[in-house]
Amino acid sequence: IVIGLDAEAAPIHVDNFVKLAERGEYNNVIFHRVIDNFMIQGGDFQNQDGTGGYAAEFYGYCDGNEQPNPCNYESQYTIPDEADNGLVHDSCTISMAKTNNPNTGGSQFFLIPEDSEPSHLDGVHTVFGEITSGCSHVTAISEVPTGAQGQDKPNSDVTLISVDIIRTAVEDTV
């Protein structure tokens, strides 16, 4: 799966994602939430179940609240929303997962398969890139059997082996 990141539209989200990827935080992380015709979610490098993960560094927010000084704990680092950047949740895009509260994105992200265009997320979650190759793999993952632990967790783990950053003259690609 190749993703072009849009640093112009979502500079903080792209910076955060790239730093986490370069630190290896996404290596061997599972897609813990998979919903057919909607999305696949991963990036919880802390707990692998959707309850963990945090931003790569202090971006001015701790647990969703703007702060002048860094948080007491790295696990409190969150990033400000950039959801009003003009990018929308079309099929084959990447967006930042967060809680129901603003400015609570950290490390978790979700990929939109070919058969989904969840426009109800526009202006709420930040789209920060587009899948330029391999979206059929995202769609295939979205169709795996789920229900493990009574949730949208795949019955068998689907693991993101590694995320590699390839710098180009135009944009970052993962």
Task: Give the predicted meaning of each segment.
Residues I1-V174:
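Cyclophilin-like peptidyl-prolyl cis-trans isomerases
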